[in-house]
Amino acid sequence: MSAIPLNRILPLGFLFHLLIFSFISLSSCMEFVEDPNNQGRISLQQRLGNQWAVGHLMGKKSLQDTDFEEMESFAKRNVENMRAALLQEQNRAESERELRHAQLVVRNILEQYLKNMQN
């Protein structure tokens, strides 16, 4: 019987599959290659337009339009508003504490009254 040994077939099969896969990958890559003549036109179109928020220029436009004197007065008004809100919150918390205390006193009075009524 003249059979071809397995150790001779495996390297040939590996080589065949390697060539097939490289050809398939090369053909699929060729579909996505752009025309070199269009590349200049595409990059030129990308440069047109507003670039104030691109890369290292991110946010620079908004900083240039700010008036620093206006920022200081805004900060003063903001601190005053925060102080007023804090005082209002403290007053509300104190009134809630007073309300809880009054409720506790009324509850104690009612409990004492009910105990006296049952006796």
Curated annotation (Swiss-Prot):
A biological process term (GO) from this entry: defense response
UniProt cross-references to PROSITE patterns, sorted A to Z: BOMBESIN (PS00257)
UniProt propeptide residues: 30-44, 62-119
Main localization category: secreted
Methionine amide found at: 58
Localization (cell): Secreted
Signal sequence, renumbered to the chain: 1-29
Single GO cellular component term: extracellular region
Pfam family membership, one: Bombesin
Highest taxon, organism lineage: Eukaryota
Annotated InterPro entries: Bombesin
Keywords attached to this entry: Amidation, Amphibian defense peptide, Cleavage on pair of basic residues, Secreted, Signal
Tissue: Localized to the cutaneous granular glands in the skin and the brain.
Family listed: Belongs to the bombesin/neuromedin-B/ranatensin family.
Chain's role: Stimulates smooth muscle contraction. Role in induction of hypothermia, stimulation of DNA replication and release of many gastrointestinal hormones.
Annotated protein name in UniProt: Bombesin
